[in-house]
Amino acid sequence: QAITLRLSHSGYHTQAITHVGMTAQNFFSGVVGTLIVGLFLASCGGDKPTERNGNDTTTTASPATPTTPSVPPPAAVGPEEFTFEVVNKFPHDPKAYTQGLVWLDGFFYETTGLYGESTLRKVEPTTGKILQKVAIDREIFGEGMAIRDGKIFQVTWRNETGFIYDLNTFSQIGTFQYPGEGWGLAQNDQYLILSDGSNILRYLDPSTLREVGRVNVFDAGSGVDQLNELEFVNGKVLANIYQTDRIAQIDPYSGKVTGWINLGGLLKPEERGPDTEVLNGIAYDAKSDRLFVTGKRWPFVFE
């Protein structure tokens, strides 16, 4: 009952990548192929102003005028458009203002936002029961999260500070700094990947937590901003687009949007409460190839 998303092998539009202390060859390898996703749904700040709208400009050299007729080149391949099939749904705290969602070893780890309400929690999927929770300082607006090497990394909205927690105890064991806002956070084998509400993805070295590169995300030559909660799935970055029902599938090397997942209608009108807000929260179970999504104050997480 999974959805098969087929990615185009052509039509890539290479973007310049700004690097600090590294080359483009070792920054990231672009991945294309077949992505099989089963969708299961459940982060970034509620009353956030629109952030930078970084439209990319690209220059294409004009070919010389041919002296003899030639066959026109094939049209550029645009991003794939995908819908969804609900495989399962699980209870979700309807008061949780979801900012980040991660699946690990049979549990959901979730960060929630808003001043005075931000938390880090571990949740039992089948019941929605909160097994472990820690509150964040009332003066801090919590944002997205990622887990690696037995640690939970969390960013904050406007404090320019991230927190590091022990995965088992939820004890805070460190902090890290970054300029500007923090919205979403994901990780792959090499990097932590940070969004800030603009069209930029920043890549952080997980050892030093310093930025080592960034890409501009674009579709049809224009920047795609409002990048919010992130998840890395089969070589692609998935990003909630804030205040929409769509998830962008992004090539991590070029920044090109290779697909759009339209989740409009996922949460039925009768399932919405007076405080229900936007789609936000993506988690991936790599062992079983399952994708989960939810939203801010949604009553369910969908697979």
Regions found by a protein language model. Give the residues of each.
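A short beta-strand motif characteristic of beta-propeller blades
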Residues: 86-91, 129-135, 171-176, 213-222, ...
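Beta-strand-rich domains and repeat architectures in extracellular enzymes and scaffolds
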Residues: 87-119, 134-146, 295-297
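C-terminal motif of bacterial Sec signal peptides marking the signal peptidase cleavage site
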Residues: 40-43
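A short helix->beta-strand "capping" segment at the edge of beta-propeller domains
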Residues: 72-95, 125-131
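Short, low-complexity, disordered segments immediately C-terminal to signal peptides
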Residues: 45-71
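Short loop/turn segments that connect beta-strands within beta-propeller blades
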Residues: 123-128, 166-170, 206-209, 251-255
